[in-house]
Regions:
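Phosphate-binding and adjacent anionic-ligand microenvironments
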Residues: 178, 216-334
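Gly/Ser/Thr-enriched, mixed-charge loops and adjacent short helices
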Residues: 48-174
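Proline/glycine-rich low-complexity loops and linkers
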Residues: 6, 15, 66-100, 193-266, ...
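Short Gly/Thr/Asp-enriched flexible loops that form oxyanion-binding sites at enzyme active sites
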Residues: 1-3, 46-55, 130-132, 187-205, ...
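N-terminal small/polar loop signature for handling phosphorylated ligands or for N-terminal nucleophile
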Residues: 1-47, 133-192
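Short glycine/threonine-rich catalytic loop with a Thr-x-Gly-x-Asp
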Residues: 182-184, 198-203, 276-280
Length: 334
């Protein structure tokens, strides 16, 4: 990827192996024209591909993807002459820069005073390069599993109730304050309560929203599949929650365009444009820890204060279908 870009006359900054939110942050901070992540997120290795980042550290929107496909179909790219190749620069502290930005956004001293002890399941993903550094900066003691860079996920990588049994056991065995698990590219976050109870990843956004509305003001945006917990929390504070089409770019673009306070998705993603342009599990960890410190309560006590809704998330394999006809019929029926 790097060689092709430089051979095309494009200057490249290599930030190494980092979480996706770190890459988004660096693209925004350095005012780059774009970025490329090689990732399959929580999917199996055969799904590895190029995740394209646009200006401002946001993923490409629908219009940009259409334009990109047209350029690809033209097959008009070319390599430049030898003396016109792009430059190559390596940055080794991208994660540290990202963490510094998060730390500036929160009350680090309040967290440090609590001497938290947490359990983490990194699923052998990129979170293992960043989260320990964040926790150390926050004065938090960490006990972890699946913290090896093997290139293979230790279990189902998507953060959900079905993949968190090992983390739950770790929490109960070590009597920690909370358990955290991230997906392999660390843009999504799920938690286990201090008694080992596994809760839906929908609570991640609700907890972050509860904290953010306790220290700041403003409306929010979430996608259509997100739990109504956040609507109830917003109503308590007198704020509104806009709903967007599913897709991180739809949420983040709506937040920026309408100058909203924050946004997110019920799959464990929190977006705070003042810190980072996309879903950020590292920020989510910091916000939840500060919420616990600020309210001086256990995570279980805080969860019990949030309105409860049930949601079942299942994936079904289906035969090849005509997507347009299928969606048209769904719209007609509902």
């Amino acid at each position: 990827v790097i060689s092709t870009l430089t051979a095309s006359g494009i200057n490249v900054i290599d930030i190494g192996i980092t979480p996706t939110p770190t890459a988004l942050y660096i693209v925004e901070k350095l005012k780059l024209h774009g970025g490329i992540m090689v990732s399959a997120s929580h999917n199996p290795i055969e799904w590895n591909a190029l995740k394209l980042i646009g200006k401002g550290g946001k993923f490409l929107d629908e219009k940009s993807v259409i334009e990109l496909n047209k350029l690809y179909d033209k097959k008009s790219s070319r390599f430049v002459k030898a003396l016109e190749t792009g430059t190559y620069q390596k940055i080794d502290d991208a994660i540290e820069q990202h963490i510094k930005r998060i730390v500036r956004f929160i009350d680090i001293d309040k967290i440090k005073k609590r001497n938290f002890k947490v359990a983490c399941d990194y699923v052998n993903g990129t979170g293992l390069f960043a989260t320990p550094k964040l926790l150390k900066a926050l004065g938090v003691k960490e006990i972890s599993i699946n913290k090896e860079w093997t290139g293979k996920f230790s279990h189902i990588a998507e953060p959900s109730a079905n993949s968190m049994k090992s983390l739950s056991d770790l929490v109960k065995k070590n009597k920690v304050d909370i358990g955290f698990t991230q997906d392999p590219d660390a843009d999504r976050l799920a938690i286990v309560l201090n008694d080992g109870t596994i809760v839906s990843e929908e609570y991640t956004l609700a907890l972050c929203a509860k904290y953010l509305w306790s220290v700041g003001k403003g409306d929010a945006a979430v996608n259509l599949s997100t739990s109504r917990m956040i609507d109830d929390l917003a109503k308590e504070k007198g704020y509104s929650v806009d709903r967007t089409k599913i897709g991180e770019i739809n949420v983040s673009s709506h937040v920026v365009k309408n100058r909203l306070y924050f946004g997110g998705e019920g799959n464990g993603g929190i977006i705070v444009p003042a810190v980072s342009p996309g879903r950020d599990s590292l920020l989510g960890i910091a916000l939840i820890l500060e919420l616990m410190a600020k309210e001086n309560k256990t995570i279980k006590e805080i969860i019990e204060e949030i309105p409860k809704y049930e949601i079942v998330k299942e994936k079904l394999e289906v035969a090849k279908i005509d997507e347009n006809s299928f969606l048209k019929n769904i719209k007609l029926k509902y």
